[in-house]
Amino acid sequence: SVGFKAGVKDYKLTYYTPDYVTKDTDILAAFRVTPQPGVPPEEAGAAVAAESSTGTWTTVWTDGLTSLDRYKGRCYNIEPVAGEENQYICYVAYPLDLFEEGSVTNMFTSIVGNAFGFKALRALRLEDLRIPSAYVKTFQGPPHGIQVERDKLNKYGRPLLGCTIKPKLGLSAKNYGRAVYECLRGGLDFTKDDENVNSQPFMRWRDRFLFCAEAIFKSQAETGEIKGHYLNATAGTCEEMIKRAVFARELGVPIVMHDYLTGGFTANTSLAHYCRDNGLLLHIHRAMHAVIDRQKNHGMHFRVLAKALRMSGGDHIHAGTVVGKLEGERDITLGFVDLLRDDFIEKDRSRGIYFTQDWVSLPGVLPVASGGIHVWHMPALTEIFGDDSVLQFGGGTLGHPWGNAPGAVANRVALEACVQARNEGRDLAREGNEIIREASKWSPELAAACEVWKEIKFQFEAMDTL
C-alpha cells in the first residue's frame, strides 16, 4: 500500500541505522543515555537522534514532502558503559544541512534541545561532538588566537599571569583601579574583572573602565611591559555590551571580557567579531557552566562547551586548575585543554576525547587556570599547562601579608623560577617545592607568601604517571 500511513511507530525503525557509514561532513555526537526501565537502548538512541533532528512523536503527512533519508539524524552505534548497569554511549550522526552556518546557537538548539526532556529517557548527557571541517570553516573562531596574542603582548616562553580583583563586589571605581595598578606594577601581566562585575550602583562600568585604563598605562610606563585588565563588557542587552567594548577600544586598552554562557552564544559571537575587527583580545569566563556540566549523567560535558567557545570566539577561557584533584580528572582536563589549543586532536577515550577533531587552523584559545591556587602550586601548574596558559591567582596575590604589589612579585618570581628550572632540565614534579624554596631565599616577597600558604598541601605525586 503506497501512501501515508498514520500512527505511532518505533523510532528505531527509522533512526537506528547500525550499518550507516559516517560522512566527513556529518556532525557526530556521543550521548550518554540512561533509558527508563524497559526501554531498549536502540529505541532510546534512536529517539535521541529523531528528536534532535527531523522526527516527531507520530508519523506526519508532511514527511512525504521531503527526503528523510537525506536529513535525518542517525544513531549508528551503541556501547554499554562499563560499570553502569543501564547506561549506554549512543553515537549519532547529523547531516550538515540541518545546521545554519556559523551559528553555535542553532547547533545547540538542535543537538541539545527537546531531546533532553524526553520521557523515555531517565537522563541524557552530551559527552562530545565531532565538528566537521566543512562546518568549522563557517566560523571565525577566536578573535586573535595564541600566537597573535603573544605578539601583541610581546611575551614569550612562559605562561601569562593574572589576578581577579577582590572583593569582587563593593569597591568604588577608584579603589578598584588602585588594586589593579598595584598588581600590574608588581609583575602580573593581567588583572581581571570578576564575572559578576558588570555595572552596579557602587561602581558603574564607565568609571571602572576609566580608572582601570589609568592603572594599565601607569604600570606599563613604570615596568616597560605591556599590561592588560579584562574589562567585563557583559551586559543586559547586546547593544549595551557592544557599547562597552567600543569604549574599551577608544581607551586603547588591549582586552575585554565576556561571560559567554550567561550572555549567550549569539551575543558572544557578535562580541568576538567586534574584537577581531578592532584588535581587542577577548577573555571568556564560564559562569553557569556547572549548571550544565556538573551532573555525570545529564547535561553536557565541559569539553563540548569548550569546543563551542572556540567556534563562537574567545582568546582565553577558564578551564579548571587540575591541581589537587583526582587523577582521572587531570587527564580529562588536559584533554579539553588540548581541544582548545591544538589544531588536531586524536581520539583518546582515556582523556574523554570520543572523536578525532581537526580544527583546520581555527585559532587556538589559551586555557585559564583559576581558583584556589598559590605560589606552592606554581611548579605543578607550569608542568601541567605548559607555556600556553594563563595562571590566575586572586586570593593568591591579594592575600599576601604585605599587599597586592608584593603578592604580584611573589607570583612572578615563582613563575620565572619554575620556567628557568624547567628550561635547565630540572624535574618540576619532583623538585617543585625545592625550586620554590631556593627562589624564596633571594625574594623576601616570595618567602612571605611561602610562609602564609605553607600549610596548604597539594598532591603532587600523581604527576609522574602522566
Swiss-Prot record:
One of its GO terms (cellular component) is chloroplast. PANTHER family: RIBULOSE BISPHOSPHATE CARBOXYLASE (PTHR42704), RIBULOSE BISPHOSPHATE CARBOXYLASE LARGE CHAIN (PTHR42704:SF15). It comes from Aesculus pavia. PROSITE patterns: RUBISCO_LARGE. The disulfide bond which can form in the large chain dimeric partners within the hexadecamer appears to be associated with oxidative stress and protein turnover. Heterohexadecamer of 8 large chains and 8 small chains; disulfide-linked. The disulfide link is formed within the large subunit homodimers. The lineage of its organism: Eukaryota, Viridiplantae, Streptophyta, Embryophyta, Tracheophyta. It is an enzyme of class 4 (lyase). Belongs to the RuBisCO large chain family. Type I subfamily. Substrate binds at residues 114, 164, 168, 286, 318, 370. Keywords: Calvin cycle, Carbon dioxide fixation, Chloroplast, Disulfide bond, Lyase, Magnesium, Metal-binding, Methylation, Monooxygenase, Oxidoreductase, Photorespiration, Photosynthesis, Plastid. This is Ribulose bisphosphate carboxylase large chain. RuBisCO catalyzes two reactions: the carboxylation of D-ribulose 1,5-bisphosphate, the primary event in carbon dioxide fixation, as well as the oxidative fragmentation of the pentose substrate in the photorespiration process. Both reactions occur simultaneously and in competition at the same active site.
